[in-house]
Swiss-Prot record:
Source organism superkingdom: Bacteria
The protein, known as: Nucleotide-binding protein BamMC406_2474
Source organism: Burkholderia ambifaria (strain MC40-6)
GO molecular function terms listed in the Swiss-Prot or TrEMBL record: nucleotide binding
Keywords: Nucleotide-binding
PANTHER family recorded: UPF0234 PROTEIN YAJQ
Length: 161
């Protein structure tokens, strides 16, 4: 029976490359001369450092630009609040989201059931497995989900016959 998984996961290798490119651009830009602006990564947590709020916004813009060039959807980023760290310096923690959340998984299952397409959807941890008898039905479900779920980037993998 054909099936596929609906997942939401960023390519962490591309995220790391974008961070390295961002740090390189920040170190060479004239408006960051003599400042301690940088982006650090620990697992799925990015920390943005800057001298003030304005430069933090500039660092964020550089990072978003580099992520977009490397085809990483910026909807994966979850911004924390801006924290003061000694003097005028500020930092912001950005988390890279992974997996389909429980609410989104329920929404996907409801969308699939309401579509009246002859497929079954089940929640499997941080993914949603969609199973059907025809490959065409599965492809129409993929098209429907791409159209209806816009707040979170979705990937479709493990497409099996």
């Amino acid at each position: 029976m054909p099936s596929f998984d609906v997942v939401s996961e960023a390519n962490m290798i591309e995220v790391k490359n974008a961070i390295e490119q961002s740090n390189k651009e920040i170190s060479t830009r004239f408006d960051f001369k003599g400042s301690d602006a940088r982006v650090e990564q620990k697992e799925r947590e990015l920390t943005l450092f800057a001298d003030d709020d304005f430069k933090l916004g500039q660092v964020k813009d550089v990072l978003i630009n580099k992520l977009a060039k490397r085809n990483v959807d910026v909807r994966f980023l979850d911004y924390g609040k801006v924290e003061k760290i000694g003097g005028d310096k500020v930092k912001q923690i950005v988390t890279v989201k992974k997996g389909v959340t429980g609410d989104l998984a329920k929404k996907i299952v409801r969308l699939v059931k309401d579509s009246k397409i002859k497929v079954q959807a089940s929640i499997q941890g941080d993914a949603v497995r969609v199973t059907g008898t025809k490959r065409d039905d599965l492809q129409s479900v993929i098209a429907m989900l791409r159209k209806d779920v816009t707040d979170t980037p979705l990937d479709f993998n493990n497409f099996r016959d």
